[in-house]
């Protein structure tokens, strides 16, 4: 469980989000939405522990879990001489001995991850040969094989086509059904309404947080 006690996200002393109070329950699935520049990605980085809160408190109960993280802008350079399988296997590194290498179970997990995103046939291709959509699928497979209890996704569908977006969305739903907690920054209101039970909507002054349907209804009323 993640508890936000008057949490304000931002950079240094510059507050970007309003103060947030609430709880993200273990096993929940939450979309963070709002206009560009309202602090969605900043909040997600704060929840992940990459940024300290400007003010307020972030509490983990019972303790901070391992996080599967998919950034909006990846830091992995496609010029590196890595294969698709190399990158996906990085998700298993926390559970792998440096001296023993990848055991059968880990190799099976990597193969499953590649299969789930439709990249099994490209496992040994170097990453500089991938299209943008294939690259995003590879990074998502890395998160999937990690099997972290908490998964944070920052704009996972940016720059990819509809078919790839839906493929990844189906994998996110499966991860949630398996008991993983999902927090995702999204712009796609249709997918939020269809798949995410809980929504946190940010704007410059206030936040709406709760079941997706009521939050969406309030937003439509404000826009009318």
Tell where the protein language model's regions lie, with residue ranges:
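Conserved ABC ATPase signature
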Residues: 126-130
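H-loop/switch region of ABC-family ATPase nucleotide-binding domains
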Residues: 186-187
